[in-house]
UniProtKB/Swiss-Prot annotation:
GO terms for cellular component: cytoplasm; microtubule. Its main location: cytoplasm. SUPFAM superfamilies: Tubulin C-terminal domain-like (SSF55307), Tubulin nucleotide-binding domain-like (SSF52490). GTP binds at Q11, E69, S138, G142, T143, G144, N204, N226. The keyword Ion transport does not apply. The keyword Repeat does not apply. This is Tubulin beta-1 chain. It comes from Lupinus albus. SMART domains: Tubulin, Tubulin_C. The gene is TUBB1.
Length: 447
């Protein structure tokens, strides 16, 4: 079976990850002790993708949990599904990374990384045919960003032909936890551009807006935000876990979404948006789902797709529905909004249909888009980075851990290159004259 190994790192990653497992367990009918109590044989058909079946009939998540301090792990362990994980798969240090990327990547994290890799190896050997890894982390702190990217590069070295998918929470423009977020995020993006295959970009501010505007929650908690993220994660991976009429795996997803290797940062969205605890009474139709899913307000990162163009997009519908209707709706969206899609990639929207809806819903859909407007996120982080780096503010925390200023400069220019690549393809046209291409060749020579 095509297994996926899940890794969560740092406080944010562990909290999102714990929520994700609650959702996936519920969908597969697995209770908090790992026993199956579901009523549908489809729940078990591909349960091996995320679970290992132990000899006693219990299902154990293929998950590795890591952090540089024990706090978050303890709360995962004492949480609703804390007892389902393999105890050996909790790997943690005592010192913490103090929101410092260098501590996570070079000093504290580097000391712990081997024990994490041992667990990863053990889990990978347990797989029949591992298709890839998914990593949950944030880019603003120290552990998820620094140690997370260190682990990704080590895994890349050891398993070069396996897919690497990340769910990365970017620092938000208005909601900031720490002042050095732009440093940590830029250094992380520098790594993710090179070592990850697909990055789902999330961001707390966009999630706050969804909770506030759409779900009408006056004071959204992290629990509410994580509820949205886990719904999306479950949607992104549903066609890997359940049989469906049009299925995909991590590699097919990448092939359909990534026209150029560096441009692998995706926006995600989910429909119908429901808050925790509320159930929807009215079943949505496929056209309504499609409309809500493409809505800019539904995107879980602070970039507006209307400011750019879609290179590619992929939609995953869940529930009993006709594939014909899904295809018609998707074509309809493309025809109505043709200016928002690049014309030099024909048929750039793919859809998959999976028969099993999420718990409590009749139908749902998840959206993954590769839009050039994601450059807004990178631009914003880059501006904040430059403002501080120009004055060398807070730099001693990083150089004190053995980092060099050169690394900051490289990360900054890599991020700026990424932004200009997105811009270049946003402006590109499908002219037949060939003039376009000559220009691009010149650009290539200069670089």
């Amino acid at each position: 079976m095509r297994e996926i190994l899940h890794i969560q790192g740092g406080q944010c990653g562990n909290q999102i990850g714990a929520k994700f497992w609650e959702v996936v367990c519920a969908e597969h009918g697995i209770d908090s002790t790992g026993r199956y109590g579901g009523d549908n044989e489809l729940q078990l058909e591909r349960v091996n993708v995320y679970y290992n079946e132990a000899s006693c009939g219990r299902f154990v998540p293929r998950a590795v949990l890591m952090d540089l301090e024990p706090g978050t792990m303890d709360s995962v362990r004492s949480g609703p599904y804390g007892q389902i994980f393999r105890p050996d798969n909790f790997v943690f240090g005592q010192s913490g990374a103090g929101n410092n990327w260098a501590k996570g990547h070079y000093t504290e994290g580097a000391e712990l990384i081997d024990s994490v890799l041992d667990v990863v190896r053990k889990e990978a050997e347990n797989c029949d045919c591992l298709q890839g890894f998914q990593v949950c982390h944030s880019l603003g702190g120290g552990t998820g960003s620094g140690m997370g990217t260190l682990l990704i590069s080590k895994i890349r070295e050891e398993y070069p032909d396996r897919m690497m998918l990340t769910f990365s929470v970017f620092p938000s423009p208005k909601v900031s936890d720490t002042v050095v977020e732009p440093y940590n995020a830029t250094l992380s993006v520098h790594q993710l551009v090179e070592n990850a295959d697909e990055c789902m970009v999330l961001d707390n501010e966009a999630l706050y807006d969804i909770c506030f505007r759409t779900l009408k929650l006056t004071t959204p908690s992290f629990g509410d935000l994580n509820h949205l993220i886990s719904a999306t994660m479950s949607g992104v991976t549903c066609c890997l876990r359940f049989p469906g009429q049009l299925n995909s795996d991590l590699r097919k997803l990448a092939v359909n979404l990534i026209p150029f290797p560096r441009l692998h940062f995706f926006m995600v969205g989910f429909a119908p948006l429901t808050s925790r605890g509320s159930q929807q009474y009215r079943a949505l139709t496929v056209p309504e789902l499609t409309q809500q899913m493409w809505d800019a307000k539904n995107m879980m990162c602070a970039a507006d797709p209307r400011h750019g163009r879609y290179l590619t997009a992929s939609a995953m519908f869940r529930g009993k529905m006709s594939t014909k209707e899904v295809d018609e709706q998707m074509i309809n969206v493309q025809n109505k909004n043709s200016s928002y899609f690049v014309e030099w990639i024909p048929n750039n929207v793919k859809s998959t249909v999976c028969d099993i809806p999420p718990t409590g819903l009749k139908m749902a859909s998840t959206f993954i888009g590769n839009s050039t407007s994601i450059q807004e996120m990178f631009r914003r982080v880059s501006e904040q980075f430059t403002a501080m780096f120009r004055r060398k503010a807070f730099l001693h925390w990083y150089t004190g851990e053995g980092m060099d200023e050169m690394e900051f400069t490289e990360a900054e220019s890599n991020m700026n290159d990424l932004v200009s690549e997105y811009q270049q393809y946003q402006d590109a046209t499908a002219d037949e004259d060939g003039y376009e291409y000559e220009d691009e060749e010149e650009i290539g020579e200069e670089a």
